[in-house]
Structures are given as structure tokens and as C-alpha cells.
Amino acid sequence: AADKQIAALDRFELEGLGHNIDFVSAIMQHPRFRSGELTTGFIAEEYPDGFSGAATSDDLLRTLAGIAGFLACAQADRARQVDGQLGDDLDPPAEWHVRIGGATHLVDVSEEDLLVDGEHLNIGLEYTPGDRLVVADIDGKELAVKLSKTRTGFKLTTRGASHTAICLPAHVAPLAAYMIEKVPPDLSRFLLCPMPGLVTAIHVGAGDKVEAGQPLAVVELLFARLGLRLG
């Protein structure tokens, strides 16, 4: 029953709202839950630092790398069919470097086989660019994976965790080492408002000492008043 529930959660799509689908899936997979050794302190005991995704095995990450490489190849094949392109009709790259879970895998895609790091991946998969869910048949077992496109690959969600896969053609991947990493700006000294509005009150002045939780300003947003506090 737990396995069927996990499979159902993998297929459930909910976007735009916060949800606990991954957390419920992780609990269903937890050995302690499956053995029935539960107490009212289960969540606090097993997730004392909060939940950031279910643990993922190396085998599953390797499988996801293969899926991501296949998806990237399908996307490239779709792109080459756009009308009005200049030059020769090129085949999509067959070799891809897929970085996922902190490791890089070499994925070789062909009509006859799918290789990950030189090893055959026994998988059956159908995908049309734009699909938000794929169901892969792996050694006779189904694995449902939710998809969302990123600038350099895909976000893959399954078995209670989301993974970002960066997919680059093998002849392009070495150049990624020369890309300058973009460091996010330090916004710790700024007061951020969730949406545009009209400032109706400011409770502090230049040079004032402020503490966490202290009200700093009031903003009017669509006829609602929002108090901004120091986080």
C-alpha cells in the first residue's frame, strides 16, 4: 500500500502553491514508518533540522541522469526541425554531460541504446517536448518523474525529492569551467517588500538601532496594509 501511495504521489502535479507532497513521499519510504515503529515525536526525531528532500540513492541519481540526457537529446532534435534555419540539417548531439546530485555523468543516446557512464541502462521511455510528466519502465518497474524546464536542463522530481540536472553536449561541457560563477548580491541591509505598494508610515530614522521583529514601515497594497518588520 505504501509503494502504491508513493507511485501516486510521484504522478500528482501541483504547482504555484506550497505543498508537502515530497515530505509525505519521504515518510512513506522511511524504514521506521514502514516498520510501524511510530511515536508522536517521529517527525521531530527524524527531521530535527527540517526537511529538504528524501534521501536519494546513487542508482536513482544515475537513472535520472540517463533520463535527463534522453530529454535533452529530444529537445535538441525538436529544435533542429524548426523551419527557416540556415546551414545544414544537423543531427542532435548524441553524447551529453549531465550534472546532477554533485556528480557528472556521461550519457550516450542512440536509437538502439542508452548508456550512462558507459553502462547500459535498461529503460523504456516516451517523451514529447513539453510533457510535464514521464513514466519510465526500468527493469520492469515504473518510475514517474515530474519535469520542469530550466535554462540549462531540467528539474526532475520523484520519490520525495527534486533534482536539478544540468545537461550540456559533450563538446560544449568542457567550456563550462570557464564560466564565471554569478554571486547573488548581499541584500541583508535592505528591507524587501513582497510587491509594489505605497509607503504610508516609516517607524525608524537614520542611525536608529533596530532589533529582530521590530516594525520598520507600513505599506499599502491593494487596499490592504502590510507591516514590514526586521527579519
Walk through the language-model features, giving the residues of each.
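Conserved beta-strand residues within beta-sheet cores
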Residues: 24, 104-106, 144, 162, ...
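Catalytic P-loop NTP-binding/switch module of NTPases
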Residues: 142, 148-193
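Short aromatic-glycine-enriched beta-strand elements
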Residues: 133, 153-154, 214-217
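Catalytic cores of soluble metabolic enzymes centered on carboxylation/carboxyl-transfer
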Residues: 2-122, 212
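Structured functional modules or segments
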Residues: 183-231
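Conserved nucleotide-binding/hydrolysis modules and their immediate coupling elements
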Residues: 108-133, 137-144, 151-152
